[in-house]
Amino acid sequence: MSDFTMFQNRPITSISEEITQKNSLSSAFKTQFIAVASGKGGVGKTWFTISLAQRLARQGHKVLIFDGDFGLANVDIQLGLMPQYDLVDVLGRRIALGDAIQSCTLGQAKFDVLPGRAGVPAAAGIDSGALNGLLTALRKMSKYDVVLLDLCAGIDPVTRHLSAMSDILLAVTTEEPTALTDVYAVMKLYARDRVRLGEKSTDCRLVINQVSTHRSGQQTFDKLAQACKNFLGWTPVLAGMIRKDTRVPAAIRMQSSILVTTPNSFASVDVARLADRLNIPENASLAF
C-alpha cells in the first residue's frame, strides 16, 4: 500500500481534527512549509519559487518544490525535467509519494521536485482530507528543511487551503494595479482561512517582483500595507523586492536559474537577499 493510499482512506472530516493534526505535526516535525501564491498569472511566481529553492539549497538546506498548480503545472518544464510520475499519479494511488519525487541539480545546488501535471483539472476532485494527508506524508518523511509549494494563481479552494495550512505565505505581485488588487484578495482570504483553521496568527510576506527601482517598490508596498491595515486590521511583512531584469527571460528559456546563468545580476542579488532574510533554521527537519 502506498503512503498516499494510507492517508487518503482516512479523510479529515472536521475542522477540529484538521487543527489537532496540524498542531501535532508542527510540534513533532520541523519542516518549514512555505506557500508561494499570487493573485494573477504572469507575475513570476514559478520562476521565483525555483530561484528561491536554488538559493536555499546552496545555503545547505534540504529543499523540495511541491508543484501545487493543479492543472497548469510547469515547474518541471522550467527545469527541463521529464518526470516519469507526478502528483496526479500519487493522488490516483498509482505510485507512492516518495517514488514521484525527482532530484534536480541547478549549478552547484541540489533539491527535489514533486512534479504536477498540466492539462488535468485535478483540483475539482480533491478534498481537504486528501490535502492534509499529503502534507502529513511530506512532514513524516522528515528529510526536508523547506517545502516550497508553488501554487496556482488565483483563489481556488485548493490554493486557499494549502496556503492556510502552510507556515509562511509568500504572496507574489508586481507593481501593476491589477496584480495588486488580486494579491490583496489573496491575503484577505488567507487571513480568513487561517481563522477558519483555528490559527491565531498569520505569517504573510509580500514579494514585489519586477520593480522599476527599490524606491518605487517600497512605495507600492506602503500603499498595499496601508490598505491591509485599514480594511483587514493587519499588515503583511515585506519579504523583499526583485528588480526588473532582462536576463530573467533568457534564463527561463535556457531552463535554468538566473542565479546560475548571471549570479551578479540585479534579480539574482535581490532573490539571494530575500532568501537570506527568511532565516530558515539549519537542518530544521532533523531538530526533533
Q: Can you name each region flagged by the protein language model?
A:
Residues 65-145, 252-253:
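P-loop/Walker-type NTP enzyme "switch/lid" segment
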Residues 229-258, 271:
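Beta-strand-loop-alpha "switch" segments that mediate conformational coupling across diverse proteins
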Residues 45:
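Conserved lysine of the Walker
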Residues 1-42, 54-55, 61, 99:
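Extreme N-terminal, non-catalytic leader segments
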Residues 70-72, 118-121, 154, 176-178, ...:
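Conserved nucleotide-binding/hydrolysis micro-motifs of P-loop NTPases
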Residues 151-240:
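Conserved catalytic-core segment of NTP-binding enzymes
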Residues 253-288:
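NTP-binding/hydrolysis catalytic cores, primarily Walker-type P-loop NTPases
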Residues 48:
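Hydrophobic positions on the alpha1 helix immediately C-terminal to the Walker A/P-loop
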